[in-house]
Structures are given as structure tokens and as C-alpha cells.
Amino acid sequence: VLLGVLCVFSNTPNAIAVSTARDVNNYKLYTHIKLLDAKEYRCVELLWTLESRWDPRAKNPKSSAYGIPQILKLKELDPYKQIDLGLKYIKARHLTPCKALAFHKAKGHY
């Protein structure tokens, strides 16, 4: 019986990691569908990997930036709404994800 309990607990972190990886893949797929352009998707994929590793709960310790896109004062908890808001922000401020990524490379933020 003890061996069975140890097996269950030893597998728990792997189950959590798999579901998190699946979630991240779903967030990326959703973003790709929103953008359609493969080059622009690749830029936002790199940008948000740098910013949050696609974690919808990511918090910036130096500012109020939060979520996948690391938007200042973001209150939205839903990852898909975070993505929508992040893409809207990029379009308003930088026009394209590739321009946002270039800005990030030069300044360390976008």
C-alpha cells in the first residue's frame, strides 16, 4: 500500500507540468489564430516568452505589469482575454508584434 501512495505522489508534479504545457500550447494556438501571419505570430511568441513565459499569473516584481502580455495594471485573470488585450495594446502602440519585439530588444520592455 505504501508503494502505491509513493507512486501517486511522485507522479503529481509531472501531471501538473503536462497540464501547464497543454495550457500554454492552447494560449499559443489561440494567439496564432488571432494573428494568422506566421512571422507576426513568431514575434509575439518570442516577446511573450521573454515577458512571462506565457504564464497568465506572471507578476513583474518591478512594476504593476501582469499576465501573459505583462500589461501595466492588468486586472484580467482570463488568459484568453489577456491575449486579446495584449494584441490590442501591441497594435495601438507598435502596430505589429515584430515592431513590438524590436522595441523590446532595444529598450528591455514594450
Pin down the residues of each PLM region.
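Core subunits and conserved enzymes of cellular information-processing
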Residues: 1-19
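Alpha-helix capping and helix-coil boundary motifs
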Residues: 4, 23-26, 37, 78, ...
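Export/targeting segments at the very N-terminus of extracytoplasmic proteins
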Residues: 13-54
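Catalytic and binding regions of secreted/periplasmic enzymes and modules that target cell-wall glycans
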Residues: 46, 60-110
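Extracytoplasmic/secreted cell-surface and envelope-processing proteins
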Residues: 56-58
